[in-house]
Amino acid sequence: MAFTLTNKNVIFVAGLGGIGLDTSKELLKRDLKNLVILDRIENPAAIAELKAINPKVTVTFYPYDVTVPIAETTKLLKTIFAKLKTVDVLINGAGILDDHQIERTIAVNYTGLVNTTTAILDFWDKRKGGPGGIICNIGSVTGFNAIYQVPVYSGTKAAVVNFTSSLAKLAPITGVTAYTVNPGITRTTLVHKFNSWLDVEPQVAEKLLAHPTQPSLACAENFVKAIELNQNGAIWKLDLGTLEAIQWTKHWDSGI
């Protein structure tokens, strides 16, 4: 079902990162009511740039580390919901590309995303009288087919795809729909910092960037298109400037 972003309230976790910042800029062109950015590091210059793009949109920043306990996330969300009354979309975009830091990669890329999602269900779940909502989780094409030299990062992104697909199937119960956007290799500062697990490929970043990539802006444009298409359960591939819905092959069914 097509979705208009006009006059909507959006929370964007990691909305100041490489792809995140360009996506925030694209979102502002859609005349949101509020864009709430949650990020670990405050960037006043970036916030000022965003506010200047569309003065009609209220841009607010809160410091947020996705690795905090759920109780802290819930406390922050209470503050946001008290101010805005309603939130329409949550974008979970926090991610690191560092297979040297195993625990932190899992905590940021997967556990933090799950915890942030779990926390917002307190406010959205229709079983608790909530209005429902839309969750957009940022995965990666490595969630489909791993970059085997970075198995920790790739594994977290596969987990994001499966978690989000489960959320989508739970929508009749919770009232919350969900989908993933999965960028291909995108030219950001993060990619240059890519390193491999146990240094199995010391030049993994250089080798990846030797292949065709996409600019962050092209990815951001398709990112917002995916949000507007609003297909519950969709697995979007954002690669080389294109937007494509992936058809996931079913090899097993739980039967429940």
From Swiss-Prot:
UniProt record, GO biological process: acetaldehyde metabolic process; acetyl-CoA biosynthetic process from ethanol; alcohol catabolic process; behavioral response to ethanol; NADH metabolic process
A Pfam family assignment: adh_short
Quaternary assembly: Homodimer.
Annotated EC: 1.1.1.1
Catalytic residue positions: 153
Protein name: Alcohol dehydrogenase
Annotated GO CC locations: cytosol
Catalytic activity: a primary alcohol + NAD(+) = an aldehyde + NADH + H(+); a secondary alcohol + NAD(+) = a ketone + NADH + H(+)
Family the UniProt entry places it in: Belongs to the short-chain dehydrogenases/reductases (SDR) family.
Species whose genome carries this gene: Drosophila simulans (Fruit fly)
Record: residues binding NAD(+): 12-35
Annotated GO MF terms: alcohol dehydrogenase (NAD+) activity; aldehyde dehydrogenase (NAD+) activity; protein homodimerization activity
InterPro entries in UniProt: ADH_Drosophila-type (IPR002425), NAD(P)-bd_dom_sf (IPR036291), Sc_DH/Rdtase_CS (IPR020904), SDR_fam (IPR002347)
Keyword Oxidoreductase: yes
